[in-house]
């Protein structure tokens, strides 16, 4: 067939749960054909990847804190989406907090969309927020196109986004049940968390946020979801003790899924140097035995996807001057590095790029109902990544595209380099041409 705007040919294409030689035909920004290598497709432009490169679907990162408007010294739409594109991420979904105003009603969503317009290099969707007092606005947020709503079950760290108590959580879920909405939750129980001792020793901070903080909060979420029938999702699982609770809930018919993040799959508490607050996040990075259990949970499907939880701040807020884990902001910036970070660890564990595409593209897109994202298949957006899985590089934070050069991966040698990124059939370049998405796009 003729008439394709773009044909991308590769000896290794990740599509349909397999890796095979193929040609991908694109017209009007949409994949129209995926055919075996020996079949010719004629296009206005034809790109043949070198043998060392693999064609992946563009990744979908559903856990990104862009922080604009209001805290653009931390991050912003231009820098975050440029970092995403450089890392093979073609769709991000922005979290409702750390921006001012937080995205807790349709008016705030419109403010955020206006802030993003014209400066995004990849496609961007939005989460709404559930906070005390906005239950009556959740259906309007849903109608305005958010992919779901997020709540905290303990203090979020910013005063404009307070947590829900158990009664407020049930009220929010009851409201969402009328539109079959999705609620995602930061699951830590404040009653199980002690004050972090001041100082440079990571072990003190880790001990202040034990696994029980996660398990208690997840148990409460499961109970509320079971009562209301609403679909819920646990963000950034760090404690392996959560996994049996998730398995039991799914067996009982609760509509629950969960994610983990690159740092929980690749870092270990025993390796965190004294005062290295770039490793601080909440919930915390735990030990290597726990890390192995998270990989097992990912392999058996208990954890459905891997997303970055890109949560940047200024270097000053990381308190590098003192290295005080108690005082430093908790958050890890890894949007540009998620793919090579996870791939480096995954290949060492015998996993394949089929797994990467499932965990980091297909399932995140399915989670948030972005039906045209996450797969190389006819009818999907032509969001494509040329990835050299065997090429290595050393992380230089100053070479990354996000705003502040802070990374726990500084100096690490990682495997896998993004050679090229296409958004809806066009190479991502110097001009921002991303779209602002609504649920269902």
What do the predicted segments below correspond to?
Residues 1-57:
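Histidine-rich, glycine-flanked metal-binding segment
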Residues 11, 320, 324, 378-440:
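C-terminal cap of metal-dependent C-N hydrolases
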Residues 11, 24, 29, 52, ...:
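Divalent metal-coordination and catalytic microenvironments
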Residues 53-119:
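Metal-associated gating/positioning segment near the N- to mid-region
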Residues 69, 95-121, 126-135, 140, ...:
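Active-site loop-to-helix "anion-binding N-cap" substructures in soluble metabolic enzymes
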Residues 106-122, 169-185, 337:
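Alpha-helix-loop-beta-strand connector modules within alpha/beta enzyme cores
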Residues 136-151, 157-306:
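Histidine/acidic residue-rich metal-binding segments in metalloenzymes
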Residues 203-208, 212-231, 304-306, 312-390:
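His/Asp/Glu-enriched, well-ordered alpha-helical/loop segment
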């Amino acid at each position: 067939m003729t008439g394709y705007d773009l044909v991308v040919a590769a000896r290794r294409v990740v599509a349909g749960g397999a890796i095979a030689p193929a040609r991908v035909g694109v017209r009007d920004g949409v994949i129209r054909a995926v055919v075996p290598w020996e079949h010719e497709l004629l296009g206005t432009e034809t790109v043949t990847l070198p043998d060392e490169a693999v064609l992946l679907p563009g990744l979908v990162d559903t856990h990104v804190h862009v922080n604009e408007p209001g805290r653009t010294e931390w991050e912003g739409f231009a820098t975050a989406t440029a970092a995403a594109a450089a890392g093979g991420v073609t769709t991000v979904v922005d979290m409702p907090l750390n921006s001012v105003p937080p995205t807790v009603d349709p008016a705030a969503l419109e403010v955020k969309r206006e802030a993003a317009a014209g400066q995004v290099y990849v496609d961007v969707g939005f989460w709404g927020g559930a906070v005390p007092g906005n239950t009556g606005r959740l259906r309007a947020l849903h109608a305005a196109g958010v992919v779901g709503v997020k709540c905290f079950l303990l203090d979020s760290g910013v005063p404009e986004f307070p947590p829900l108590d158990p009664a407020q959580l049930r009220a929010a879920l009851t409201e969402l049940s009328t539109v079959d909405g999705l609620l995602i939750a930061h699951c830590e129980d404040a009653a199980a968390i002690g004050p972090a001792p001041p100082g440079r020793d990571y072990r003190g901070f880790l001990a202040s946020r034990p696994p029980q903080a996660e398990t208690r909060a997840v148990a409460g979420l499961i109970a509320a979801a079971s009562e209301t029938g609403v679909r819920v999702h646990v963000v950034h699982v760090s404690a392996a003790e959560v996994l049996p609770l998730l398995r039991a809930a799914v067996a009982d018919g609760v509509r629950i899924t969960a994610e983990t993040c690159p740092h929980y799959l690749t870092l270990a508490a025993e390796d965190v140097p004294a005062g290295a607050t770039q490793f601080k996040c909440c919930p915390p990075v735990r030990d290597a035995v726990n890390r192995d259990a998270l990989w097992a949970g990912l392999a058996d499907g208990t954890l459905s996807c891997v997303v970055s939880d890109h949560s940047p701040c200024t270097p000053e807020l990381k308190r590098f001057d003192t290295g005080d884990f108690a005082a430093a902001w908790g958050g890890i910036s890894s949007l540009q590095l998620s793919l090579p970070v996870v791939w480096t660890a995954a290949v060492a564990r015998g996993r394949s790029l089929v797994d990467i595409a499932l965990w980091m593209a297909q399932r995140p897109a399915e989670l948030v109902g972005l039906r045209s994202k996450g797969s190389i298949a006819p009818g999907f957006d032509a969001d494509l990544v040329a990835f050299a899985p065997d090429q290595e590089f050393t992380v230089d934070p100053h070479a990354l595209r996000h705003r502040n050069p802070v990374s726990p991966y500084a100096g690490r040698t990682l495997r896998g380099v993004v050679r090229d990124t296409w958004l809806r059939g066009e190479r991502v370049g110097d001009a921002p041409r991303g779209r602002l998405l609504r649920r269902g796009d």
